[in-house]
Amino acid sequence: MVRIKDVADYVGVSTATVSNVINGKEQRVSKEVREKIKKALDEMGYVRNHTAMMLAQTTSNMIGVVIPHKDGMKIALEDPYYSAFLGNLEYEIRQHGCYMYLIAQQSEEEIIRQAIAWNLEGLIVCNMPADELNSLSEKYSRGIVSIDSYIENQSDVINISTDDFGGGYQMGKYLIAQGHRKIAMLADNDDTVDHHRWMGLKQAMDEAGVSISETDHFLFSPSESVRELQMEQFFPDLQNYTALFVASDFYALEVSSFLQSKGIRIPHDISIAGFDDLLYAKLARPKLTTMSQNMGKKAKMAVEALLYLQEKRKLERQKQKQNATLKPNLIENPDADNPWTLPVKLVERESVRRIV
């Protein structure tokens, strides 16, 4: 690897002079010498050591992204939701001249250790339980943006969420409008996101006078092997419903595949609807009716929220009298009362049929 000293010796200048050119401090170097150094850098194939440069600076331009570990999955990226969201998040981070540093959720101590070791600008934390997130925020002060954690926004923590209750409510109203009265929900937990979707569904059905209870709420394991056994156990009961609302597209497609393997015709015998509107939803057969959340906007909001916290922290350090305020219109969110909550919309495809 070519070093700064090698370039300096080649041109016949000091290492400080070469360093000034590399770091954009060209006003300190004559035009003639500057051009010689740049030519030498190209000819010798010099590549900047970004790791060393980052550790030497007060800022790293690296944003930490913490993704959860899901029981039964080797890596969270096996879940297509996280793959899609992280792709959008990396793009938005890059648009702001920063880099994404991915942390698969480990202990609180390990998250903080990596954040400090890599001088991260802040953390975007996905689906961390509220108690763990509150504990982390007490020990890490550079700013945290949580995704779908359902905590109260704090001075150094902002939660970005989807209107999960509204999504469940809209789906319930839609299924009822299609003539369905025997509706069940399937999910892998009854916490945070999935809980709010279930409560929204219940609200819609209660308003319509349609009976629904906890016996219509099927919870299965995040572990695929365990889930397969549970679906076999659920199958006799699932045949009593005309429509199934599944908490994610990933699980909805899995449920659809399982039922079709048992000879159930989708949607003729049982209708199925999901949540997220992933790419696979429109590629499935039949194409999946689902609630769509705008992952691109969600990622954009997350990065802007973290940059807002950075700016606020900077102003506080400078002891300026006027606090920074991020106006809701900067994130192009029509809901001014809940600027950090994303609306959802129904996408009607082929997996739900109307019952006459």
Regions found by a protein language model. Name each.
Residues G72-Y81, Y99-E110, I160-Q170, L186-Q230, ...:
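Hinge/beta->alpha junction and helix N-cap segments in small-molecule ligand-binding domains
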Residues S19, L55-I75, Y174, K182-D188:
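Short beta-strand segments enriched in small/hydrophobic residues
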Residues M1-T59:
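N-terminal helix-turn-helix DNA-binding module of bacterial transcription factors
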Residues Y169-A208, L326-V352:
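An alpha-beta-alpha
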Residues E228-V356:
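Flexible loop/turn connectors
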Residues K182, I212-D216, I266-S271:
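Short acidic capping loops at alpha-helix termini that bridge into adjacent secondary structure
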Residues V2, M62-K173, E232-N240, F250:
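Alpha-helical recognition/docking segments in bacterial nutrient-uptake
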